[in-house]
Regions:
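Conserved mixed alpha/beta catalytic, RNA-binding, or beta-rich assembly cores of soluble enzyme
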Residues: 72-84, 95-127, 189, 219-309, ...
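Short, conserved beta-turn/loop elements at beta-strand boundaries and strand-helix junctions
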Residues: 23-29, 262
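Generic structural motif
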Residues: 8, 14-23
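Hydrophobic alpha-helical hairpins/lids featuring a short glycine-rich hinge
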Residues: 32, 38-104
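Hydrophobic beta-strand signal
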Residues: 1-3, 22-23, 253, 270, ...
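Short hydrophobic beta/alpha edge segments that flank linear recognition/processing sites
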Residues: 1-8, 25, 36-41
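Hydrophobic alpha-helical positions that pack around
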Residues: 140-252, 258-263, 273
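Ferredoxin-type iron-sulfur electron-transfer modules in oxidoreductases and energy-metabolism complexes
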Residues: 291-307, 317, 321-386
Length: 386
């Protein structure tokens, strides 16, 4: 471990390589924002003796609930769907709340990304053990694995493997973006609606990503911290696409090089998928725990069209999965009217990008909504701290 969590909603960081620390400071992340970082000169590939690197499947877990959560916390496990919320926090159910169901998110609805799909196909047995461990940590009797119908091989594979787990059920889901959003997934699987401003635990659910269940298995059964993850490297501009098991800290440029290098007509590098991903300003930035994919877009497809005036068509309202009014939030955000933004529930926005995608006026709706949401979050934190 090279960096310890400094609060409850925080996660430990482990070195993914053996070597010598050469610098402690700040480096630009993928978006160009300077972040705390530790630089290590790689020296060989030595592992701690307590880490079980064998491929043997360890199904039995005799740890108590508290021991499971402690091991997950020590391993630095976070949500690997992109939000990177510490997993041990999700497993620590607040007083007065009760977890009834665990839902494993195997939807992966973001276009181009297939990392979770490969994990389900190639590490399905380990995933199921991880799911069972998470169920025990939560004290729930039922776990569901939600997978969209466009992954029939994963559905069939996990159904066969889960025959020995009567409390785990694979649920095929309609192909619909953004089906992988927590609240959308809960409604699709359980038929329960998370209230505005609420959390999944408010309706008795805890959601974990498919990749997270694998990381939990490795942490609890193999004593392995979160030092690597599967990343989709893709895009029509690339000569070689793949899902790669990547050490945390690997430069994004190394993944692009593996894919054949940067084509001349590349217009944009995206960290994530085309809907919710963000443009990469620094290709030398490291892969992080939340890096699900690196997407290269050709120049022709990456140029934004000139925004026009809103024509009040309400298409953005019609496609919003949260029932919000994106055009209204866009206007408030542009005018820095944060009280109004809070009043129209901007914090409920899941940043799926449907509004921007469908806007006939090419307005940068999501860009301004993200800015407004960030400012409202600051106001709410300040208010809570008083």
């Amino acid at each position: 471990m090279i960096s310890a969590a400094d609060g409850f909603v925080s996660a430990n960081v482990h070195s993914s390589v053996s070597g010598t620390v050469t610098a402690v400071g700040e480096v630009p992340d993928a978006g160009g924002v300077r972040r705390p970082a530790i630089t290590i000169a790689v020296e060989g590939d030595q592992w701690l003796d307590i880490i079980d690197r064998s491929e043997s499947l360890v199904k039995e877990c005799h740890l108590t609930r508290d021991e499971i959560i402690t091991r997950i916390k020590n391993a630095g496990i976070v949500g690997m769907g992109g939000a990177t919320f510490p997993t041990h926090v999700k497993l620590s159910v607040p007083v007065g709340k009760k977890a009834e169901f665990l839902i494993v998110n195997g939807v992966e609805c973001e276009p181009f990304l297939t990392a979770d799909h490969r994990v389900m196909l190639e590490r399905g047995a380990e995933m199921l053990v991880g799911t069972d461990i998470l169920s025990r940590a939560l004290g729930v009797d039922k776990a569901y694995i939600g997978i969209e119908n466009n992954k029939p091989d994963a559905i069939e594979h996990l159904r066969q493997l889960s025959a020995g787990y009567p409390d785990i059920e694979v649920v095929p889901l309609r192909v619909r973006y953004p089906q992988g959003g927590e609240k959308q997934l809960i409604e699709a699987v359980l038929g329960r609606e998370v209230p505005s401003g609420g959390l999944p635990i408010d309706v008795g659910a805890v959601v974990q990503n498919a990749g997270t269940t694998l990381a939990v298995y490795e942490a609890v059964q193999k004593n392995k911290p979160l030092i690597e993850r599967v990343v989709t490297v893709t895009g029509r501009a690339m000569s070689r696409t793949a899902n790669l098991k990547v050490r945390i800290g690997t430069p994004i440029s190394s993944l692009i090089e593996y894919g054949g290098g940067m084509p001349e007509d590349t217009g944009k590098i995206v960290n994530g998928g085309p809907m919710m991903g963000r443009a990469v300003a620094n290709p030398e930035a490291p892969v992080t725990k939340g890096t699900s994919g690196i997407l290269l877009i050709r120049r022709k497809g990456s140029v934004r069209k000139t925004p026009q005036s809103c024509i009040k068509c309400a298409k953005c309202v019609g496609v919003c999965p949260m029932g919000l009014e994106p055009y209204l939030m866009y206007g408030f955000a542009r005018r820095l009217r944060y009280e109004e933004l809070e009043a129209v529930h901007i914090t409920d926005c899941i940043e799926c990008g449907c509004c921007s995608y469908t806007c006939p006026a090419y307005l940068p709706l999501l860009d301004y909504i993200r800015l407004g949401k960030s400012e409202v979050a600051k106001i709410l934190r300040a208010r809570k701290a008083r």
